[in-house]
Amino acid sequence: MAKLILATFAVVFMALAATSLAGDPDMLQDVCVADYKSLKGPLRLNGFPCKRIENVTANDFFFDGLMKAGNTGNAVGSVVTAASVESLPGLNTMGVSMARIDYAPWGLNPPHTHPRATEIIFVVEGSLDVGFVTTANKLFTRTVCKGEVFVFPRGLVHFQKNNGNTPAFAIAALNSQLPGTQSIAAALFGAAPPLPSDTLARAFQVDGGMVEFIKSKFVPPKY
């Protein structure tokens, strides 16, 4: 009996562990096209409610937003165009998404994390200096050229920088329909309400005036 209980516990534990390692929960039907209209009501859940199957069309599984380069005319010189469940409703419950990342010459996709997904990028044009930092603060970095691939582990801080004087772009794949993106600088210096300046000053070991100067570069979101 003891062996049976132990074996049962082991099987249950392994099943739970496998589920916890998945990027998104497994789908329970062929398709579950996101019904954005339902979000205006009281219904809230981890994901999106399904559109009625009789209202689903092929267009729910189509997105042409990655065809053209995005506008990189901003302070960091990069822009991300996401093909996630928010723009491609047919991705709901599929556990995957894509993105196009465009870089101006010397443009930077600043240090950020994806809390819900691992990311793999394929460089289509140009050459990028990329890297990620582990929880032990070890940096893994290298140059990735046209036709090459690099992977960023889930939840770790990472970046990409165009190291050339011509535009570059890459295609990213992620194992979540909505991986989430948190820019480190914007999260710390552009939060709403703002983080206390004395907290940031002590964390970065600088004076309060420097913190206020950096905060002035970020526009807090409006809720």
Swiss-Prot record:
GO terms for biological process: plasmodesmata-mediated intercellular transport; regulation of root development. It is found in: Secreted, Extracellular space, Apoplast. It holds the Pfam family Cupin_1. GO terms for cellular component: apoplast; plasmodesma. Residues 1-22 form the signal peptide. Its main location: secreted. InterPro entries: Cupin_1, Germin, Germin_Mn-BS, RmlC-like_jellyroll, RmlC_Cupin_sf. Residues 64-212 form the Cupin type-1 domain. This is Germin-like protein 1-3. It comes from Oryza sativa subsp. japonica (Rice). The lineage of its organism: Eukaryota, Viridiplantae, Streptophyta, Embryophyta, Tracheophyta. The gene is GER8.
